[in-house]
Design a protein with these regions (language model features):
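Residues that recognize and position ribonucleotide moieties
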Residues: 16, 50, 62, 106, ...
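DNA target-recognition patches
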Residues: 21-73
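Short beta-alpha junctions and helix-cap segments that line functional grooves
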Residues: 37-40, 100-102, 172
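Non-catalytic DNA-recognition/assembly elements of restriction-modification systems
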Residues: 1-34, 46, 156, 160-203
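Extended hydrophobic-aromatic, low-complexity segments
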Residues: 99, 123-125, 137-139, 166-170, ...
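Short, positively charged
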Residues: 118, 122-153, 157-159
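A short glycine-rich beta-alpha junction/loop motif
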Residues: 92, 106-113, 144-168
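A short beta-sheet element
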Residues: 53-54, 64-131
Length: 203
């Protein structure tokens, strides 16, 4: 979608009633996170607030994170608590341009842009749209000079947006819910495998 020419976008608008919006215009708000100081133990020790790193964003559903921060860590840094159904995009590193979908409330580091939408249907539409556009996003980011993205670049990505009733009729949240269930099942199987291997090694 990002790589449509002006004439192609105009054709869509005129012919199908679709229209063009930037990510910033489509979303209620976009935010980047931060990393609470690693030297302040009370920001991390015993933390229960999920904190997502860019390496954990790889076209996936986020149900748990490798690290958590404390309330003090949230209050003592510029990271923000993002609501469930926020869409994520990694801005730096090997996963730059890849997308995630929050199935939990979570904070993120500074290498992630969080995109908050009006509805679950719009969030799901944005998630799948950005996945579809990844190759074009990679080509156009910073003129192709480097792999890193900026929040400003993400805010200005063009989306082809159908009328609200069309987005609702696609029932994309049902696909997201099935992905969440599948992810939970994978976690259960991983835990069973870990338990079985631990029992075998103790014999």
């Amino acid at each position: 979608m990002i790589n449509l020419t002006d004439s192609e976008m105009e054709s869509l608008v005129l012919k199908d009633g679709f229209f063009i919006k930037t990510v910033a215009d489509f979303c209620l708000e976009t935010k980047s996170g931060s990393t609470p100081s690693r030297t302040t133990n009370e920001f991390w020790d015993g933390g229960t607030i999920s904190w997502v790193k860019s390496g954990e964003v790889h076209n996936n559903i986020t149900l748990r994170t490798e690290e958590c921060i404390t309330q003090e860590g949230l209050n003592g840094s510029s990271t923000k608590l993002l609501p469930t159904d926020t869409v994520l995009m990694a801005m730096y590193g090997v996963t730059a341009g890849e997308v995630g979908y929050l199935a939990i409330e979570a904070t993120t580091n500074q290498a992630i842009c969080g995109m908050i939408c009006n509805t679950k249907a719009e969030a799901a539409y944005l998630y799948f749209s950005l996945i579809q556009s990844q190759a074009a996003i990679s080509r156009l980011s910073n003129g192709g000079a480097q792999d890193n993205l900026s929040k400003n670049f993400i805010d200005n990505i063009n989306l082809v947006v159908p009328p609200t009733e069309v987005i609702e009729s696609l029932n994309l949240p049902a696909i997201i819910e099935q992905m969440i269930l599948n992810t939970k099942e994978i976690f259960v199987l991983e835990e069973l495998q870990y338990t079985a291997l631990a029992q075998l090694s103790s014999r």
